[in-house]
Each structure stands twice: as structure tokens, then as C-alpha cells.
Amino acid sequence: MLIIELLKAIFFGIIEGITEWLPVSSTGHLILVQEFIRLNQDKAFIEMFNIVIQLGAIIAVMLIYFERLNPFQPGKTAREVQLTWQLWLKVVIACIPSILIAVPLDNWFEAHFYFMVPIAIALIVYGIAFIWIEKQNAQQEPAVTDLARMSYKTAFFIGCFQVLSIVPGTSRSGATILGAIILGTSRTVAADFTFFLAIPTMFGYSGLKAVKFFLDGHHLDFAQVLILLVASLTAFVVSLLAIRFLTDYVKKHDFTIFGKYRIVLGSLLLIYSFFKFVF
């Protein structure tokens, strides 16, 4: 029944809206949840759905940060306009590694890593990394506390860390936040740049998935269009809350709790995979 599919779409939209911005892997969570709750749709649609619903989350970022990201915003001084264009240039530079590496390798990673065990391992590995990095940085003051002071070189290397998220379970936001902190930025700068970098990255990735879906000869029926719209709208609404939460959270806390969450979840998934394989 369509109503059941739409309820599932709402649920998946909630998962996407929360996990897209927290460093816990949205795609990984969607794949995991769909192990137990699946849309009654073909595999090609589900694979496209898992990526394209990110558009709702991206529109939320654009709405929240519209004035900050808009170089044509009335009232901005010449210096503020210049800084806005410089920010966009940093974002473009940070996209280069993904264009050169992640895009060509996407199909291979999708074929070999989009199942439970690699996701669980990635969750654990990056969970340990978050805890270790936070302990190392506990007594250190960040070198970059303002996006305006972040160099183009740093932006490029943050983009290199983003490439790591091609492995499901890694988390795009987790990889870029972790990379930015390692490179000397404050948590606030790391989170903000992660949000901004997501706009072209996820728009591009969603667009590629949609184009590939249609070029492969697939099409969308009315129910599938509705499912995508409902899931994306839900992701948009939930993302508004999740982004506000994370921006407030990083002002007072570190990311250790997310590292612990990843380790616990990854361990449970490995146990589940073991028993599923044995029995």
C-alpha cells in the first residue's frame, strides 16, 4: 500500500535528516535500517533514493546560511562580499579531490562495500579516531578559529579527507570534521565548513545518481516520485533541527560521544552479521 511506503519514506527522511549532519554516516544508517525495514521498490530505485533524499538536507543548509553564503546579500560591506567569495573559492577547491578520486571510484566502492561488515568496521575505526583525536587535542588551542583565516591549502586537504567518505559507514561530515580538526581548525570552523562543503558535494552526487538512474533505462512512477518528495521534505525539516543542534553542541562539547556511539553501533552490527552468517 502507498500509505505504508510513505510512512517508511518519512522514517527514512528522519534518519537522513539526523545522521547527515552528525558524524555518524547517513548512508550507512540508511543501508542498516533497510536491512530490517525496506521500501517495496526495486534495487535501482532504492540505491538512487538513498542518495537523492540528501537534497532535502542540503536545502536546509542553504536556508539557514543563506545570508552568510550569499555574496549579493543587501547590506554587506565590500570586505564581507570579498570574504564570501573567498569562502566559496575554498569550497570549490575542497571539492577537487572528490571530483578526481571519489567520482571515478564510486561504482566500484558501491559494488564492494555497500553491505553490513564494511559499514560496521568503518563505524568502529572512525569512532576510535574521533576519541583519539579529541584526547590529543584536549590541551591544544586550535590554530584556525575563523573561516576567513583558513587557508586554501587547508581547504584542499579537508577535501582530501572528504574522499574517505566514499566508504559507507565513514560519514562525509565525520571525515571532514575529523580532517579539519587534525589540520588545526576549531570545532565550530570544522562544522561550518562541513555544512558549506556539503552543498556542491551532495548536489553533485545526488545529480550523478539521478542521471545514472535514468541513463540505465529506469523511470519513476507516481508513487516513487511521491516517496522521494516525502522523504526529502522530511529530511529538510529534521535537518533544520539537527544543524541547529550540532552548531550549538560544538560550542560546548567535543565529538567523543559520537566516537563512542560509532564503536558501540559498529560492534553490535559485527555481532549481528556473525550470527546472521552462522545461522
Swiss-Prot record:
Residue stretches spanning the membrane: 2-22, 44-64, 85-105, 113-133, 163-183, 188-208, 223-243, 255-275
Main location: membrane
GO annotation terms (biological process): cell wall organization; peptidoglycan biosynthetic process; regulation of cell shape; response to antibiotic
Cellular compartment(s): Cell membrane
Record-level Gene Ontology MF annotations: undecaprenyl-diphosphatase activity
Keyword Glycosyltransferase: no
InterPro entries associated with the record: UppP (IPR003824)
Protein's UniProt keywords contain Ribosomal protein: no
Reactions that this protein is recorded to catalyse: di-trans,octa-cis-undecaprenyl diphosphate + H2O = di-trans,octa-cis-undecaprenyl phosphate + phosphate + H(+)
Keywords: Antibiotic resistance, Cell membrane, Cell shape, Cell wall biogenesis/degradation, Hydrolase, Membrane, Peptidoglycan synthesis, Transmembrane, Transmembrane helix
Family label: Belongs to the UppP family.
Functional description taken from the UniProt entry: Catalyzes the dephosphorylation of undecaprenyl diphosphate (UPP). Confers resistance to bacitracin.
Official protein name in the record: Undecaprenyl-diphosphatase
Species annotation: Streptococcus pyogenes serotype M4 (strain MGAS10750)
Gene symbol of the encoding locus: uppP
